[in-house]
Amino acid sequence: VARSWVCRKTYVTPRRPFEKSRLDQELKLIGEYGLRNKREVWRVKFTLAKIRKAARELLTLDEKDPRRLFEGNALLRRLVRIGVLDEGKMKLDYILGLKIEDFLERRLQTQVFKLGLAXSIHHXRVLIRQ
Protein backbone atom coordinates (compact mmCIF):
# COMPACT_ATOMS: atom_id res chain seq x y z
CA VAL A 1 0.00 0.00 0.00
CA ALA A 2 1.52 3.28 -1.10
CA ARG A 3 1.09 6.14 1.32
CA SER A 4 1.94 9.72 0.66
CA TRP A 5 2.86 11.61 3.79
CA VAL A 6 2.00 15.25 3.57
CA CYS A 7 4.63 16.80 5.78
CA ARG A 8 7.62 19.05 5.52
CA LYS A 9 10.76 19.39 7.52
CA THR A 10 10.39 21.71 10.49
CA TYR A 11 14.08 22.23 11.17
CA VAL A 12 17.44 22.39 9.40
CA THR A 13 20.55 20.90 10.96
CA PRO A 14 23.61 23.14 11.11
CA ARG A 15 26.07 23.04 8.24
CA ARG A 16 29.03 22.55 10.59
CA PRO A 17 28.17 20.05 13.32
CA PHE A 18 31.01 20.85 15.74
CA GLU A 19 31.35 24.63 15.66
CA LYS A 20 32.20 25.53 19.26
CA SER A 21 30.65 29.01 19.34
CA ARG A 22 27.33 27.71 17.97
CA LEU A 23 27.32 24.70 20.31
CA ASP A 24 27.88 26.97 23.32
CA GLN A 25 25.14 29.34 22.19
CA GLU A 26 22.66 26.47 21.70
CA LEU A 27 23.52 24.95 25.07
CA LYS A 28 22.92 28.32 26.73
CA LEU A 29 19.48 28.60 25.05
CA ILE A 30 18.59 25.04 26.08
CA GLY A 31 19.49 25.78 29.69
CA GLU A 32 17.80 29.17 29.82
CA TYR A 33 14.51 28.09 28.24
CA GLY A 34 14.42 24.46 29.41
CA LEU A 35 14.39 22.95 25.94
CA ARG A 36 14.58 19.18 25.59
CA ASN A 37 17.10 18.94 22.76
CA LYS A 38 18.92 20.84 20.03
CA ARG A 39 16.14 20.09 17.55
CA GLU A 40 13.84 22.44 19.46
CA VAL A 41 16.41 25.22 19.04
CA TRP A 42 16.82 24.44 15.35
CA ARG A 43 13.02 24.44 14.85
CA VAL A 44 12.65 27.97 16.23
CA LYS A 45 15.73 29.12 14.32
CA PHE A 46 14.25 27.73 11.08
CA THR A 47 10.91 29.47 11.71
CA LEU A 48 12.70 32.76 12.33
CA ALA A 49 14.79 32.28 9.18
CA LYS A 50 11.66 31.73 7.06
CA ILE A 51 9.99 34.84 8.46
CA ARG A 52 13.11 36.97 7.95
CA LYS A 53 13.52 35.63 4.41
CA ALA A 54 9.94 36.62 3.57
CA ALA A 55 10.51 40.10 5.04
CA ARG A 56 13.75 40.56 3.06
CA GLU A 57 11.99 39.54 -0.14
CA LEU A 58 9.14 41.98 0.51
CA LEU A 59 11.59 44.79 1.31
CA THR A 60 13.13 44.45 -2.16
CA LEU A 61 9.77 45.30 -3.74
CA ASP A 62 8.56 48.86 -4.32
CA GLU A 63 6.84 50.60 -1.37
CA LYS A 64 3.51 50.85 -3.22
CA ASP A 65 3.65 47.33 -4.66
CA PRO A 66 0.29 45.64 -3.92
CA ARG A 67 2.01 42.36 -3.06
CA ARG A 68 4.28 44.09 -0.54
CA LEU A 69 1.37 45.92 1.05
CA PHE A 70 -0.85 42.83 1.29
CA GLU A 71 1.72 40.18 2.28
CA GLY A 72 3.68 42.60 4.44
CA ASN A 73 0.62 43.52 6.49
CA ALA A 74 -0.35 39.85 6.80
CA LEU A 75 3.14 38.95 8.04
CA LEU A 76 3.20 41.84 10.52
CA ARG A 77 -0.29 41.04 11.85
CA ARG A 78 0.67 37.39 12.31
CA LEU A 79 3.78 38.31 14.32
CA VAL A 80 1.82 40.76 16.47
CA ARG A 81 -0.89 38.15 17.07
CA ILE A 82 1.59 35.55 18.33
CA GLY A 83 3.17 38.22 20.53
CA VAL A 84 6.63 38.35 18.98
CA LEU A 85 6.36 41.89 17.61
CA ASP A 86 4.98 44.98 19.39
CA GLU A 87 2.11 46.88 17.80
CA GLY A 88 4.24 50.02 17.79
CA LYS A 89 6.84 48.30 15.62
CA MET A 90 4.63 47.29 12.71
CA LYS A 91 7.23 47.75 9.96
CA LEU A 92 9.06 45.16 7.90
CA ASP A 93 12.41 46.56 9.07
CA TYR A 94 11.67 45.48 12.64
CA ILE A 95 11.15 41.87 11.52
CA LEU A 96 14.81 41.69 10.50
CA GLY A 97 15.75 42.68 14.06
CA LEU A 98 13.92 39.74 15.66
CA LYS A 99 16.00 37.27 17.64
CA ILE A 100 15.46 33.62 18.53
CA GLU A 101 14.87 34.67 22.16
CA ASP A 102 11.76 36.63 21.09
CA PHE A 103 10.16 33.37 19.96
CA LEU A 104 11.39 31.29 22.89
CA GLU A 105 9.91 33.85 25.32
CA ARG A 106 6.45 33.11 23.90
CA ARG A 107 6.56 29.36 24.63
CA LEU A 108 4.03 28.10 27.17
CA GLN A 109 6.81 26.55 29.25
CA THR A 110 8.59 29.90 29.55
CA GLN A 111 5.36 31.77 30.30
CA VAL A 112 4.41 29.32 33.09
CA PHE A 113 7.84 29.81 34.68
CA LYS A 114 7.85 33.61 34.28
CA LEU A 115 4.41 33.89 35.90
CA GLY A 116 5.77 32.06 38.95
CA LEU A 117 3.53 29.02 38.59
CA ALA A 118 6.57 26.72 38.48
CA UNK A 119 9.60 26.48 40.73
CA SER A 120 11.98 26.12 37.75
CA ILE A 121 11.90 26.22 33.94
CA HIS A 122 12.08 22.41 33.92
CA HIS A 123 9.22 22.20 36.44
CA UNK A 124 7.10 24.25 34.04
CA ARG A 125 7.56 21.56 31.39
CA VAL A 126 6.45 18.89 33.89
CA LEU A 127 3.36 20.92 34.81
CA ILE A 128 2.38 21.26 31.15
CA ARG A 129 2.74 17.49 30.59
CA GLN A 130 0.41 16.65 33.52
From Swiss-Prot:
InterPro entries hit by this protein: Ribosomal_uS4, Ribosomal_uS4_euk/arc, Ribosomal_uS4_N
Q: What positions are modified (N6-acetyllysine)?
A: 64, 114
Keywords linked to the UniProt accession: Acetylation, Cytoplasm, Isopeptide bond, Nucleus, Ribonucleoprotein, Ribosomal protein, RNA-binding, rRNA-binding, Ubl conjugation
This protein's source sits in the domain of life called Eukaryota
Signal peptide, first to last residue:
none
Q: Which family does this protein fall into?
A: Belongs to the universal ribosomal protein uS4 family.
Please describe what this protein does: Component of the small ribosomal subunit. The ribosome is a large ribonucleoprotein complex responsible for the synthesis of proteins in the cell. Part of the small subunit (SSU) processome, first precursor of the small eukaryotic ribosomal subunit. During the assembly of the SSU processome in the nucleolus, many ribosome biogenesis factors, an RNA chaperone and ribosomal proteins associate with the nascent pre-rRNA and work in concert to generate RNA folding, modifications, rearrangements and cleavage as well as targeted degradation of pre-ribosomal RNA by the RNA exosome.
List the Pfam families.
Ribosomal_S4 (PF00163)
Name the record gives this protein: Small ribosomal subunit protein uS4
Cellular location(s): Cytoplasm; Nucleus, Nucleolus
Q: Which SUPFAM superfamilies match?
A: Alpha-L RNA-binding motif
Tell me the Gene Ontology biological-process terms attached to this UniProt entry. ribosomal small subunit biogenesis; translation
Which terms in the GO cellular component ontology are assigned?
cytosolic small ribosomal subunit; nucleolus; ribonucleoprotein complex; small-subunit processome
Complex formation: Component of the small ribosomal subunit. Identified in a IGF2BP1-dependent mRNP granule complex containing untranslated mRNAs. Part of the small subunit (SSU) processome, composed of more than 70 proteins and the RNA chaperone small nucleolar RNA (snoRNA) U3.
Question: Residue ranges of the S4 RNA-binding domain?
Answer: 106-130
The species this protein was found in: Sus scrofa
Q: Where is this cross-link: Glycyl lysine isopeptide (Lys-Gly) (interchain with G-Cter in SUMO2)?
A: 91
> What terms describe the molecular function in GO for this protein?
rRNA binding; structural constituent of ribosome
Specify whether Protein biosynthesis is a keyword of the entry.
Answer: no
